[in-house]
């Protein structure tokens, strides 16, 4: 079965263009700091990733067995960096901020459904003018 998703984020994105997707993993975080590494106050919709993603929009989809695209997980602003591990530095791990540990667990449960095992497709939106 082939799944096709057309998602328009910006007016200049054409429906017939295939977005570039990166194979990766997602995690959830919560902590004592009220601010990201960029100085923004943490809030729902913030994620951490490699430094090259700072200021960009990150779209996460479940990555199902056979590398099929699963459900849309969410759309996030990358305003933080991860803990410095190889996955974060190389850009294949995204860390989604949650308000509390219960929300972290809910997020982890979501990304482990449909046998996705925490695997995600990462789409980086470079710029949105509109």
Task: List each model region and its residues.
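Solvent-exposed, well-ordered loop and adjacent helix/strand elements within mature globular domains
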Residues: 13-130
